[in-house]
Amino acid sequence: MKEYIAFIKDSKFWIPVLILVGLEIGMQFGCYRPFLKKNSYAANVSRITNHVLEKQKEFDPDILVVGTSVAYQGLSIPILNQELSTLGKKVQSIAIPGTELIVQDLAVLKTLPHFKNVKTVIHVFEVTTPWVGQKILNLPTLAMISEFNRLEVYSRIYDFDYQVNVNDLIYITLKSIAYRRDIQDLILSPSKRIKDIGKRFKIENLNPWDYENSYLERISMYPIQDISNCIEKTDPANGQPIPEGSDRFHKKAIFDTCIIANHIVTHAKEDEVTKQYFDRLKILHDEIRRIGKENGQNIQIIGVVAPYSQLIQKWRLTERNEVWKRELKRIHPSNPVPLLDYQGMLDGSDNGDYYYDLIHLNSIGMKN
């Protein structure tokens, strides 16, 4: 026992402990946030939600866009605002890449109470998501939800019926755990991170919206006929030359989405996974309407099914659309969310010119 007490009193023990506690406290107050890796999950969710709130006084929207990377890349907020300016309407977006419904819900909880004028929410859906739901909290989702109000996150992970374990709770609670991979990357590659941070401070985003898609790369740069052909021609390890105008990042993005397209289920069967998705969607939509009422608005939610490359026609099942409509009516019997289906709106001989990869539009597709 004496040896144990002596060890506790030894400066070799408590000085490192105090340093670790001090670092954790600093991270809890957001001191590390400016140093997060560019476009990481945690950096994206913080940057997007904080930016729209910072610009709220000069740009207070009437319409709010909610969704994932499909909406983030596929909708031009400047063009939408230009088109709606004659009606006196303003559009803002809190679409965040890689988000499950729980992250979209937390983004709504953080931002919508400040947007008192929002009367319409456009929720951009991906047609396949009800069939690929998650019961556990994966690392990207943990990284994003840990950036929100902790008290809201703790209750939300149970409301959304995740299978929560102790490690999940530790990850959400301790920033030193949540940021450990990011810190490791910073230590291994400090020069690149410093350059990114310098650019961020030097080039300030003065626009009210966080992002505008500027990608000019397109699928049609690669002679792709079908999914198996796509995997073969865009495999980063195939050694084939990269077409002019493309780069290794674009090639890999196409490859990754071809792998996804090759593995995602192509049926429209309803099971526990699909039911859970729509139960979670109900929580999100109920929250939007509740906050709207608190803001003095009767918010109308409009569902939009995003377009995909026509190379993945097998995702477009009439039966899936019927499941969507049926489930949207089940979760809101008195006021079901209308569903606008734009899956095939860019089909045609030049379809490949509009897509960066199989799922995301490029700048040309966004403008169309």
Where are each of the predicted segments found?
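N-terminal Sec-pathway targeting helices
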Residues: M1-L20
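Membrane/wall-proximal cationic-aromatic binding patches
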Residues: L20-K90, V103-K110
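Membrane-embedded segments
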Residues: V66, V70-F160
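Short loop/turn segments at strand-loop or loop-helix junctions that form parts
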Residues: V124-T128, V304-Y308, Y342-M345
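Secreted/periplasmic serine-hydrolase-like ester/acetyl group-modifying domain
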Residues: P140-K293
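Active-site segments of SGNH/GDSL-like serine hydrolases
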Residues: K192-R193, E287-T318
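Active-site His/acidic residue clusters
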Residues: R248-T266, A306-K325
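C-terminal regions of proteins
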Residues: Q313-N368
